[in-house]
A protein has these predicted regions:
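Catalytic cores of nucleotide-sugar-dependent glycosyltransferases that transfer UDP/GDP/TDP-activated
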Residues: 2-369
Length: 369
């Protein structure tokens, strides 16, 4: 399913990761996991990669440890921003060692990058429909940025977009499961926008068990206690807490489907392609990136509400799990992701940093989807 790798000149690349989780994360952490997949693929392709991350990160690149461990897991850490400022100082002190610096920490570095005149690019991993971001990106409009879906761009269409690069994962890391299980899966984070209450409603309407593997941030504890916890008394619902990376394979691969009933403009949704990699179809609400990532009837079903989702569950036997896996291999591998980023790096290093119009912003692999 993979196309032949393009030949790129060997580059010296810095990857600058958030410090909240290790790279890769032990448990939850979509951004850090994607940074890991990208970093390891770039190393495999022969590039000289330096990773700025927490000290408990594991990589084949040169690791520059900033904090002793992931900040979310460090009970002694009271000011996470302080560690990120220290990281920026370290990154820019080594700027001459890199052909390009790839940031994954949103806009935190913008004032320094503007003044230091380094070749850089930033992947924006979060939602952009926040009013506070409008004046910030008006001021820093020249900063080259990458979107992780075309829908993510919509609130800020006129900034310096260099392309859309969908996330990718190693094709050999996720085993393909031939047969579907007898339960529905919910994986990720428990918060209002992730739609766990909707997932529970779907499972009750469908009469099929739901297994929930998800973390609860401190900010969402009240939501869990007030809204979700009372819904867990159903015999159809089992909450197993947060699970690690190896456990994900069996959890997703043995599920009948992944439920993704979000209520927000999801920038990407890594868990969707994790499920597809295991051959497990996804039943998702049509918000944010979902229509871009999903292929109706191949990787699952896009539905508008809980009743439609319950009806879709009856049609899961129409999904060919092998074709679901093949769809992942065609569009969402880490090799494809790395090549797309290398094309952007190459263009920026050559001084070609003009914005790419939205119609051209999706790289070639999205046009044939």
């Amino acid at each position: 399913m993979e196309t032949e790798e393009r030949d790129f000149k060997k580059m010296r690349i810095a990857q600058v990761a958030p410090l909240y989780e290790s790279v890769p994360p032990v448990l939850y952490g979509g951004t850090e996991r994607v940074v890991s997949f990208l970093t390891e693929e770039l190393v495999r392709m022969g590039h000289e990669v330096t990773l700025f991350a927490s000290g408990d990160s594991v990589t084949n690149a040169r690791l520059v440890p900033i904090s002793e461990q992931a900040l979310r897991l460090d009970p002694k850490c009271e000011d996470q921003l302080a560690h990120h400022v220290l990281m920026l100082e370290r990154v820019f002190s080594e700027k001459r060692n890199f052909d390009i610096i790839h940031f994954h920490i949103d806009y935190l570095h913008f004032p320094l990058s503007r003044r230091e005149k380094v070749v850089n690019v930033t992947t924006l991993h979060g939602r952009l429909d926040i009013p506070d971001l409008q004046p910030l990106y008006q001021v820093f409009h020249e900063m080259p940025v990458v979107s992780i879906s075309n829908s993510q761009r919509e609130p800020l269409p006129n900034i310096n977009w260099q392309g859309t690069v969908y996330h990718g994962m190693p094709r050999d890391k996720y085993p393909h499961f031939e047969g579907g299980g007898k339960y529905l899966a919910f994986l990720g984070r428990i918060s209002p926008e992730k739609g766990l209450d909707q997932a529970i409603e779907i499972t009750k309407r469908a009469g099929m068990p739901l297994v929930i593997a998800a973390k609860i941030d401190k900010a969402d504890q009240k939501y869990f206690d007030d809204v979700i916890k009372p819904l867990l008394d159903s015999h159809l619902v089992e909450y197993v807490g947060e699970i690690g990376y190896p456990e994900k394979f069996d959890f997703l691969g043995n599920a009948a489907a992944l439920l993704f009933p979000i209520d927000w403009p999801e920038p990407f949704g890594l868990v969707m392609i994790e499920a597809m990699a295991c051959g497990t179809p996804v039943i998702a609400y049509p918000y944010g990136s979902v229509p871009e990532i999903m292929k109706e009837g191949v990787s699952g079903f896009i539905v508008p509400d809980a009743q439609s989702a319950a009806e879709a569950i009856k049609n899961l036997d129409k999904i060919d799990r092998k074709k679901c896996r093949e769809y992942f291999e065609k569009r969402f591998t880490s090799a494809r992701m790395a090549e797309d980023y290398l094309a952007i790096y190459e263009r920026l290093i050559k001084g070609q940093a003009a914005p790419i119009p939205h119609s051209e912003g999706a790289l070639s692999w999205t046009k044939s989807a």
